[in-house]
């Protein structure tokens, strides 16, 4: 499946802007990368795509390499001291250099001291290209980005890292600006009023974008582009979403199963013995794209339907499309192995999720939803919240992190509890060793203890949602309300101020643009550039998978008039969120940062 959305834009930037820009027919080159640039490339490109462009070998700059003095090298590097020193070292040897010549592409702005060092080195004689391509983010999905900076939550919110805060915000601002520039956007910037971080980050992004705009005056031009917005929200605006057990396929799988680096591992039973299978869950799998945002109750049904349709189209007979049946069909029709394996993977994945759900999660979901909503499935306000949570806290079969999720949801609903009450709850739950984790929610801006032991919540106003939902999936992320308000142009300007006034848009101008171009036009590089407006959302402190889903849902609801992208320093699962909280009262030497 061809890359979609944001991934397609980044692939094009790397293939056209880097590799093809220095390519000559019939000439092979070497591609040298460091860890950050390799992460960017592998998030959107296959090795076969790179090799098809006349690259003979891809190497890591920090590893020992065999010299190939007959070939020129393309360097795609982050502009760090370590990578620049390794680059200079490649051209210090005698009698020959490691490569014939160097085409250097930095993923971002190279600091002046490093630039000067390059100029003074022997490398200067063989440099044929030297460019900064401003690509300092990972395209995680078609509409999701990551700045690949999971440590930033610690730097921003741990009191021991107060001296790092300003520098960390500046780095994040630069990365967000490269995202906007890559998308050819110069958006109006808004932030949630209140927290210092969101305002500071918003102003820093504007300064970086203005520098890009000075270099490329056409950035963000186009009648509908003036409506594009970048919205910065902090995790404290919605600490509920990353705590809940989500029952949509992607979020549920990443929460309940051990999926590392987007790889799902499971046992398959073959003819004789069982063996482990590893499957990458990404957008190359069109079935995953179709299923990932569906409720688990609908997933198995959908896979079974699709499998039945596939079997009928190939004239295969199947009574019931299940995993056992699949292995029989595979034996008969090995030529369809690739397609049938895909169905098998998703049946396994759904089955795995349901096993965990039926085991211990089912009883937690209702409690979590009631606490998140402040009301039960009938819409009745919860009168006795203690009665709701005590059975969970006392249940020895519920794992500590699951108890903590319920405990934090209770504290958030109450807008904090008294110190005495908190101590009792922690004791009931038998999670004394996690008491600092629970209190650390305060570092993010949540209220954990207050002297009054208040029973009133200070939550943002929520939309009334009338569409039918599953009883255990009533909550929708706060950011979904905010996204809908932006595209309907009704987001409160006092609560979400602009850093600078948005450009005026006349409706006639917007209409002409749509009629003339539709929502797309081609740019010089040959990729389809979006002419309609974009909403780019950045959440300080990590983005939850339910929030990622919201970006797709809101885009779909606008029927393509808007494209919503969302991202953060890193992608959160509930475990990851609690792990992040756990570090916020610790010294750097005491923790293992990701």
UniProtKB/Swiss-Prot annotation:
Entry GO terms, CC: apical plasma membrane; azurophil granule; cytolytic granule; cytosol; lamellipodium; phagocytic vesicle; plasma membrane; presynapse
Protein name (database record): Syntaxin-binding protein 2
Keywords: Exocytosis, Protein transport, Transport
Biological function: Involved in intracellular vesicle trafficking and vesicle fusion with membranes. Contributes to the granule exocytosis machinery through interaction with soluble N-ethylmaleimide-sensitive factor attachment protein receptor (SNARE) proteins that regulate membrane fusion. Regulates cytotoxic granule exocytosis in natural killer (NK) cells.
Annotated SUPFAM superfamilies: Sec1/munc18-like (SM) proteins
PANTHER family recorded: VESICLE PROTEIN SORTING-ASSOCIATED
Keyword Nucleotidyltransferase on entry: no
Alphabetical GO biological process terms: cellular response to type II interferon; exocytosis; intracellular protein transport; leukocyte mediated cytotoxicity; neutrophil degranulation; positive regulation of mast cell degranulation; presynaptic dense core vesicle exocytosis; regulation of mast cell degranulation
Xref: Pfam families: Sec1 (PF00995)
Gene source species: Rattus norvegicus
InterPro entries per the UniProt record, alphabetical: Sec-1-like_dom1, Sec-1-like_dom3a, Sec1-like, Sec1-like_dom2, Sec1-like_sf
UniProt keyword Lipid biosynthesis, yes or no: no
GO molecular function terms listed in the Swiss-Prot or TrEMBL record: syntaxin binding; syntaxin-1 binding; syntaxin-3 binding
Family: Belongs to the STXBP/unc-18/SEC1 family.
Assembly description: Interacts with STX1A, STX2 and STX3. Interacts with STX11.
């Amino acid at each position: 499946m061809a890359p979609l959305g944001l991934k397609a834009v980044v692939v094009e930037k790397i293939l056209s802007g880097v590799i093809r820009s220095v390519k000559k027919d019939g000439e092979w080159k070497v591609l040298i990368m460091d860890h950050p640039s390799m992460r960017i490339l592998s998030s959107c490109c296959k090795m076969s795509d790179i090799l098809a462009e006349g690259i003979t070998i891809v190497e890591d700059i920090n590893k020992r390499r065999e010299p190939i003095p007959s070939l020129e090298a393309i360097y795609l590097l982050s502009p760090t001291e370590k990578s620049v020193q390794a680059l200079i070292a490649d051209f210090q040897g005698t009698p020959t250099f490691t490569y014939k010549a160097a085409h250097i592409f930095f993923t971002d702005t190279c600091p002046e001291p490093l630039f000067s060092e390059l100029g003074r080195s022997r490398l200067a004689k063989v440099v044929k290209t030297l460019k900064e391509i401003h690509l300092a983010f990972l395209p995680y999905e078609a509409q999701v980005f990551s700045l690949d900076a999971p440590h930033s939550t610690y730097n921003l919110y741990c009191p021991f890292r107060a001296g790092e805060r300003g520098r960390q915000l500046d780095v994040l601002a630069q990365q967000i600006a490269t995202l906007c520039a890559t998308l050819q956007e110069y958006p109006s910037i808004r932030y949630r009023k209140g927290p210092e971080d969101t305002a500071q980050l918003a102003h820093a992004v504007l300064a970086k974008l203005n520098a890009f705009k000075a270099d490329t005056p056409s950035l963000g031009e186009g009648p509908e582009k003036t409506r594009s917005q970048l919205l910065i929200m902090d995790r404290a605006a919605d600490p509920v979403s990353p705590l809940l057990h989500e029952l949509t396929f992607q979020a549920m799988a990443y929460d309940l199963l051990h999926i590392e680096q987007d790889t799902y591992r499971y046992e398959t039973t073959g003819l004789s013995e069982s063996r482990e299978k590893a499957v990458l869950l990404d957008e190359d799998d069109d079935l995953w794209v179709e299923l990932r945002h569906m409720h688990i109750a609908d997933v198995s049904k959908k896979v079974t339907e699709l499998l039945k349709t596939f079997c009928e189209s190939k004239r295969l007979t199947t009574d019931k499309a299940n995993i056992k049946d699949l292995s029989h069909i595979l034996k008969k029709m090995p030529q369809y192995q690739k397609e049938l394996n895909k169905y098998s993977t998703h049946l396994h994945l759904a089955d795995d999720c349901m096993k965990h759900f039926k085991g211990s999660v089912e009883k937690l979901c209702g409690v979590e939803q009631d606490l998140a909503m402040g009301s039960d499935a009938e819409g009745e306000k919860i009168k006795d919240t203690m009665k709701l949570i005590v059975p969970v806290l006392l249940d020895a079969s519920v794992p500590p992190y699951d108890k903590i999720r319920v405990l934090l949801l209770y504290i958030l609903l109450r807008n904090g509890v008294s110190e005495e009450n908190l101590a009792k709850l922690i004791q009931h739950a038998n999670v004394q060793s996690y008491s600092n984790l629970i209190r650390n929610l305060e570092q993010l801006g949540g209220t954990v203890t207050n002297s009054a032991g208040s029973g009133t919540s200070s939550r943002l106003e929520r939309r009334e949602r009338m569409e039918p939902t599953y009883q255990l999936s009533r909550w929708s992320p706060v950011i979904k309300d905010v996204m809908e308000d932006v595209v309907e142009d009704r987001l409160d300007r006092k609560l979400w101020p602009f850093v600078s006034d948005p450009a005026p848009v006349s409706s006639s101008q917007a209409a002409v643009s749509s009629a003339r171009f539709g929502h797309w036009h081609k740019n010089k590089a040959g990729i389809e550039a979006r002419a309609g407006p974009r909403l780019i959302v950045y959440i300080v402190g990590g983005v939850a998978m339910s929030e990622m889903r919201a970006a797709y849902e809101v885009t779909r609801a606008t029927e393509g008039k808007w494209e919503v992208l969302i991202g953060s320093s890193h992608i959160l699962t509930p475990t990851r969120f609690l792990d992040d909280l756990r570090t916020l009262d610790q010294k750097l030497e005491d923790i293992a940062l990701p």
